[in-house]
Amino acid sequence: MPVILDGKRLSEALQAKIAMAFSAYRGPKPILGILQVGNKEDSNIYVAHKLKVAESLGFLTKLVKMPENSTQDEIIGTLRNAAAEVTGIIVQLPLVSNRIENLQEILDNIPIEKDIDGLSSYNLASNYNCKDNFLSATPKGIILLLKHYNINFRSTVIALVGQSNIVGKPLAKYLSNFKNNTIKTYVKDTPKDDLHEAKIVIVATGVYQSVTADQLANGTVLIDVGIHRQGKTIHGDLDFASCFKKASYITPVPGGVGPLTVVALMFNLIKALILQNPNLDHEFLSLKEFINI
């Protein structure tokens, strides 16, 4: 019987560890900053959840919400001002504006020591093996999940289906640091004739059934990053019922990767606090294994 990778329960346990580490802490509180452009319903839900988790841990928050179709210069100016007042800041994507000329230029205005979502060019170009790098929250959440369940991701064959800057590309770079790994990368439409060779398959295409059960070997570890809402039903990029039969471990949607993305962001926020206040490093030794992913 495949093991369901319970991201919700792990997220709750990790939040409890963070709360414990901060229970006796008397230093400056981390401040989570979020810049949102427009009023997209999905974004509102995600932003509210991030703020709720941060505040439940006793962190401070700052949400800066800009009107739809703000200009690139307006967004950059607002981002710079907001970043100066917080420990770490994220730009909630997508930005609802038809006046953006270069999204990466906006993201590159996040100070590197505050880029807790890891989307600046500096972080995207890194190999995530330096103390000042931030691995994006979703890849970091995936690593937290694999580590917790003692799933080998250091000397195996791993397939990454989907090559976005948010998930696929940074995760491929991080996993490539382990020299005994074989990393196979696919975009959503490329042939996957050799996908059955992978021991771990991570799917993040945003397309339902971009990987199907017949492409997988028996005993595959399946990590589904996608999320799709159809009426009252929520599912991932995989057809859970058919892929479940091929899996040794599998993430549910919801309740798999999603909850860990938010807690990974909190670990990155703590890392930003330490980078800006090196004297605080000793305060969070109990969290070091999570912060330094």
Swiss-Prot record:
InterPro entries of this UniProt entry? Aminoacid_DH-like_N_sf, NAD(P)-bd_dom_sf, THF_DH/CycHdrlase, THF_DH/CycHdrlase_cat_dom, THF_DH/CycHdrlase_NAD-bd_dom
Which pathway does it operate in? One-carbon metabolism; tetrahydrofolate interconversion
Q: Which GO terms describe its cellular component?
A: cytosol
**Chemical reaction(s) catalysed:** (6R)-5,10-methylene-5,6,7,8-tetrahydrofolate + NADP(+) = (6R)-5,10-methenyltetrahydrofolate + NADPH; (6R)-5,10-methenyltetrahydrofolate + H2O = (6R)-10-formyltetrahydrofolate + H(+)
Coiled-coil regions, chain positions: none
The record's annotation in Gene3D superfamilies points to:
Leucine Dehydrogenase, chain A, domain 1, NAD(P)-binding Rossmann-like Domain
SUPFAM superfamilies attached to this UniProt entry? Aminoacid dehydrogenase-like, N-terminal domain, NAD(P)-binding Rossmann-fold domains
The protein's assembly and partners: Homodimer.
* HAMAP family from the UniProt entry: THF_DHG_CYH
Tell me the protein family, please.
Belongs to the tetrahydrofolate dehydrogenase/cyclohydrolase family.
Q: What is this protein called?
A: Bifunctional protein FolD
Q: Which organism is it from?
A: Metamycoplasma arthritidis (strain 158L3-1) (Mycoplasma arthritidis)
Q: Which gene name does the record give?
A: folD
